[in-house]
Design a protein with these regions (language model features):
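Chalcogenol-based redox active-site neighborhoods
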Residues: 1-184
Length: 184
């Protein structure tokens, strides 16, 4: 896993992202997500990674971040990254009403650049580990935590531990409440 205080690698990858229609309703669209745009526009970027969509523990964390309202902060960007395709990302975002981009790291290139590539998990290879990263506006990784087992019910969860780092950066972020026993 990438070390804290390291420079975060930039990436451009396909993603499912929220998009506002002209009538004010939100839809989702396929896009290319460029990390540098988020880093330039925010004080911090949180990247939550998962080996695949619909992994219950990862979903619990993504939903907790959604419910904490991190996506609505002007000084914070949230990105989820999974080892699945855009099509799975669309279904996942719709099922759990996720209001932040979901990057499709189908071949593991982004995960590899962050040293978060799992050799294999449940018969899949070259997929991301479950992790949470906080990147500040200077491209410094300020927080990095990964789980050896994506199904581990970490207490506190990495997204909860990341809250303190966000506050140190100056981002007023509510601490997410991760409920692993939800309807995932």
């Amino acid at each position: 896993m990438i070390d804290t205080d390291a420079t975060a690698p930039d990436f451009i990858a396909p993603a499912v992202a929220p998009e506002a229609d002209g009538d004010g309703t939100a839809t989702r669209a396929a896009t290319e997500l460029a990390l540098f745009r988020l880093v330039e526009a925010h004080d911090a970027v949180v990247c939550c990674t998962a080996p695949a969509t619909f992994v219950p523990t990862c979903t619990a964390e993504f939903v907790a971040v959604r419910d904490a309202g991190w996506h609505a902060s002007d000084d914070l960007a949230v990105v989820a990254l999974t080892g699945d395709s855009l099509y799975a990302g669309f279904a996942y975002a719709d099922r759990f009403d996720l209001p932040f981009p979901i990057v499709a790291d189908f071949h593991g290139g982004v995960a590899d650049s962050y040293d978060l590539l799992a050799d294999s998990w449940e018969g899949h290879s070259d997929i991301p580990h479950r992790a949470t990263l906080v990147i500040d506006g200077d491209w410094t990784v300020r927080f990095a935590a990964a789980a050896d087992d994506p199904l581990d019910r970490a207490d506190p969860a990495p997204v909860q531990r990341a809250t303190e780092t966000l506050r140190e950066i100056g981002v007023d972020a509510e601490r997410p409440r991760v409920e692993y026993d939800g309807a995932w």
